[in-house]
Structure formats: C-alpha cells, structure tokens
Amino acid sequence: VSMLHPRRAFGSALLYLNESNSVARAALAKVRAHLKAKGVRTWSVVGRTGQDALRRAELAIALGGDGTMLRVAREVAPHGIPLLGVNVGHMGVLAGTEAAGIGRRLDAVLAGRFKAEERWMLSTEVHRAGRRIFGPELALNECVIRCGEQARAITLFTRSGERFVADYFGDGLIIATPTGSTAYSLAASGPIVD
C-alpha cells in the first residue's frame, strides 16, 4: 500500500471515517469542504466501498486512528489508490496527519509536495486438506493464525507461494510486516523496526 504516492493531480477522493468517532465526523465535513473548494470530487464511505467508486478514486483519506488506517489499507491497496491518514483517534502512528493541520496538509498533497511511503502487505490464505478455507485476505500489520477459541497445540505447514518456509508446532503463528513488527516493538518499549 502506498501511504501517499506522487503522481498526477488528484481529482477525486474517497473519504473514509470511523463513524463511532464524533471528531472524525466533524473532520469529514471540514475535509469535504476543503477538497470541494479545490475542485476535488469526493465520496464519503462508511463500511465497505463499492467497486465503481474504487475504480474512479484517485486518493483515499482515512479519518480515524490506526485501526481505521488498517481497515482502509486492506480495501484500497488492490486498486493502487494512495492513502492519507488523518489522526482523530487514539493511536496515530500510521494516521500521521493531525486533524488540526488538515487544511495545510491537503494543500501540500494536492500540490504534489509530500513524501511517499510504500508499505509491504501480507496476503494470507489458509488451506486444510488441499482446500482453501480462508482468504485471500490482505493485512498491513500482521496475520494471526490459531486453532480457535481454545488454546491447543497444532502443526502449521508454512509456504510462501510454492516455496517451503517451515513447519511450526504451537498454539498459533503471528506473521508481521515491517509495519506490524514496529507496532509490536513499540508496545514493548523497543525501537522502530525498518
């Protein structure tokens, strides 16, 4: 997923929000008005986006916290839509633009003055007895595979494409991207992982 991607001017934007956050709802009105004044067509999204809107969008803006960013990244990444996060939530590591400075940030983005960050994503499928039972699903942070609600040991045979990786015996497996491993490291008072 591209957190921002320098390219042609942005003429349309999908505006995603965490609808349970009243600050996000207020920020949505401000962002929509600012973009409209700049001639950018917008669509507000609550829940999942229709395929037609995803085909037409040139930019996605997530108004919420990091949880909103993770949800929106899964949806827009397959379409190559760049994503800007506006932090109006509790955690704003990924959603790096603060709501108070959104007007200036939007002006910079629309003028092409920004630094793009490309992020790795995981695509996960679970197969049992040769049949896919889950996936493919995208993840920006991590994928967690476990047996179910009750912890018990299982054997996991892991592959990357057709290539064997390893067999694991335990109660589950966490596979993290650099973005996800940084979150785990920071939670343990560790460093940022590149």
Explain the meaning of each model-derived region.
Residues 25, 67-73, 181-187:
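Short glycine/serine/threonine-rich phosphate/pyrophosphate-binding segments
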Residues 89-93, 192-193:
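Short gly/pro/ser/thr-enriched loop/turn and capping motifs at secondary-structure boundaries
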Residues 60, 83, 173-174:
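Short, well-ordered beta-strand core segments
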Residues 20, 66-68, 91, 179-182:
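Short glycine-rich anion-binding loops that position phosphate/pyrophosphate groups of nucleotides
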Residues 91-171:
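Catalytic core of DAGKc-family lipid kinases
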Residues 71, 75-89:
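Gly/Ser-rich helix-loop-strand patches that form or flank binding pockets
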Residues 1-59, 63, 71, 99-117, ...:
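ATP/NTP phosphate-donor binding region
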Residues 167-194:
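Gly/Ser/Thr-rich active-site loops/lids in small-molecule metabolic enzymes
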